[in-house]
From Swiss-Prot:
InterPro entries: Haemolysin_XhlA. Gene3D superfamilies: 1.10.287.1490. It comes from the Bacteria. Pfam families: XhlA (PF10779). The gene is xpaF1. This is Uncharacterized 11.0 kDa protein in cwlL 5'region. To B.licheniformis xpaL1 and to B.subtilis XhlA. It comes from Bacillus licheniformis.
Amino acid sequence: MRTGGLREMSQTNEYEVFQKEIKEIKADQKTLEKRVSTLERTSERHDQQIISINEKLNKIEENTTWIKRSITGAIITAVSTGIIGGAIAVFYNLLQK
């Protein structure tokens, strides 16, 4: 009969150890779930920031394109004015002689 009592105590201890391990696993799982939730929120925030930065970059690109066109137009106008003015001056000098 004594062996039966030891066996029951052994089983009870194993059961308690098993229950303790289950509680630890559940606590670890909750901790991991909280960490995953935090990472998901952080990831969502980063995604929004990336979208905002991309929009700003697109606006900068549009402004840069507009500035390039304006500068190119100004250069073409200046060169054309110089050529036309020079041609007029040459013809005027030829007519004077």
